[in-house]
Amino acid sequence: MADASAGGLYQCLTDISRADTSGDYQKALTSANKLIRKYPKETFAFKCKLVAQIQLSQYADALELIRKTPAHQMGHVGFEKAYIHYRQDELDEAIKELNTCDKDDVKALELKAQVFYKQENYQQAYDIYLYLLKNHSDDSDELRRANFLAVQARLEAQGVKQAVAETEDSYSQLYNRACVEIEAEKLPQALESLEKALKTCRKSFEDEDREEDEIEEELDSIRVQKAYVLQRMGQKAEALAIYEKVQAANHPDSSVKATITNNIPAASSDFALPESRKRFKAALQIDQTKLTRRQRLTLMLNNALVLLLSNQREPCKRALEELVAKFGSSKDVALIEATLHFKMGDAEAALKVLAGSDLEQSLARLHVLLNAGRLPEAVGAIRDLPISGKLGASSLLTSTLIAADSRDEAVKELVAASTAKNQTPEALKSILEDLVEVEQQRGNETAATKHLEKLVEKFPEDLQLQCRLVGAYSKTDPKKAESLSAKLFPETMEVDVNVDELEDSDWILYGEKYRQKKEAKSPQTAEIAATRKLKIATKRKRKIRLPKNYNSAVTPDPERWLPRQERSTYKRKRKNREREIGRGTQGSSSANPNVEYVTASPNSPRPLPGPVAEGPRQQRPNFQKQKKKKNASKF
């Protein structure tokens, strides 16, 4: 054995072992290079160098080392090559390399399960983890169990029901269990699991003497998931507070950043579109390899939606094209694209995009037809809806038929709806009232009266309906109208009402508020009223004052109340006699004997064109303005 101080084999191996224990892989790489130079035939040295390069993320150098090193010196490196491809997001190449490994190699099986999970082949990942949990047990059982729960959460999201065992101990397992419960719509249970995960995470990290920053970073991931659950449960204010707190902490995890950016606009009722555009633009520049396919798709969809709401039409169009290129078309993409076309005034293009047969696209297509005024096509679209038998669809169809001036068809639809089974009383009342209105619009008072009779029969306590029936009878059968009116409003009613008190009450004229104010101003109890002396209200009689020159023998002038200028005995001054010419009622002429009317001579000049008449107006005398007196100078 060579001397240790001279950098012999023993010293190099010791340095590699220490570096691996301390996590100093740069030192391990240096020791491996030294070992290869001194002992080029040592197979173990090449493997150590390869592992050190992988740990230092020197993937290109690691692949170059595998390519240059002969297979008999390097040994089998299928797992290492697969891991490099996995970290470089070359998942298909990773699967090829893993297929060359031993079928019972636990490391290769776990890596294959992770690759399947990233490829979203969740059922294959589920089978591998289930096999490992049943047939292998080592120090990685806790991590294996957490990964298994993560796969179960994804399967639950795809609609594959999962049974979760109550064996979670670590915070990772509790967190992933909560994810399964979220996908199963068990939100209260998920919230409880996340609360346990927060406590367990802090305790386990404190037991390991981790720094507070590291603990908070891990807790923030759980808090964001908790905020999502609160948001789904309708507690948006609490969820928004958590999102903003985590966002202020500047979390380094790309998945957490993307989740916060995506969820804040949905949780906030008054979010600003310009600010949201900036956040989505920043979120799309995050390392996309660390996000799941579902997260990337949701992020790009919401980005396109925010651009659409901001009226950024060209950027929205480009965002949709990029989305379709990466993930293909979908129902949500079609809805956003159709809305964009409709906003740009191209209803035909919007209808071409909405070619799907699902309910959402059918309703969107109907919305476009109605807004474009294509009522006959809209009627056909309503009838093709899978929910055409529902009350809302029937009401919309009737309104559309009436707007299209097809009242006969509208009546048929309403009659069919009124005879349908399992109708609630409120729905039946609404349908019959619509029938009455349509029949009255058609001028068919007899049919309207029949429908009103049905309404009164179904709802005999509704006085308003009975009054409407009286009005209908007055047009078709006056005798029935009189009979029903006498029944509803008899001449003598045995009601305990004090008519005199009602007539003397002011609150009937001025409303209930006047009554309440009057009672509040003078609260009197029965005891005080009984002991107090009642004052008899006496009218104050004012003494009659007569004019000084009053003569009782002379009859008073009947025009004494008229203004002086309007009395028959009034004589105008000469200069004011011509003022009243042309005055009086609109359209009438006044004949004043003092005015001479002279016809214009044929040779008289043509008058200049006057202003255009603006219609009749109330005329007023033009009084001369009084001249302002000059102010005397002050000393």
Curated annotation (Swiss-Prot):
Q: Which UniProt keywords apply?
A: Cytoplasm, Endoplasmic reticulum, Repeat, Ribonucleoprotein, Signal recognition particle, TPR repeat
Would you kindly state one Gene Ontology biological process term found in this protein's UniProt entry? SRP-dependent cotranslational protein targeting to membrane
| Coarse class of the protein's main subcellular location | cytoplasm
Q: Name one Pfam family in it.
A: SRP_TPR_like
TPR repeats, residue ranges: 7-42, 75-105, 106-139, 171-204, 220-253, 255-290, 436-469
Classify the source by domain of life: Eukaryota
Which portions of the chain have biased composition (kind: Basic and acidic residues)? Answer: 557-569
> Any keyword Ribonucleoprotein?
yes
- Which spans does this entry mark as compositional bias, Basic residues? 625-635
List locations, semicolon-separated: Cytoplasm; Endoplasmic reticulum
| Gene Ontology MF term list | 7S RNA binding
Q: Where is this region: Disordered?
A: 539-635
Q: What does this protein do?
A: Component of the signal recognition particle (SRP) complex, a ribonucleoprotein complex that mediates the cotranslational targeting of secretory and membrane proteins to the endoplasmic reticulum (ER). The SRP complex interacts with the signal sequence in nascent secretory and membrane proteins and directs them to the membrane of the ER. The SRP complex targets the ribosome-nascent chain complex to the SRP receptor (SR), which is anchored in the ER, where SR compaction and GTPase rearrangement drive cotranslational protein translocation into the ER.
Q: What protein am I looking at?
A: Signal recognition particle subunit SRP72
- Can you name the source organism? Caenorhabditis elegans
* Lineage, broadest ranks: Eukaryota, Metazoa, Ecdysozoa, Nematoda, Chromadorea
Gene giving rise to this polypeptide: srpa-72
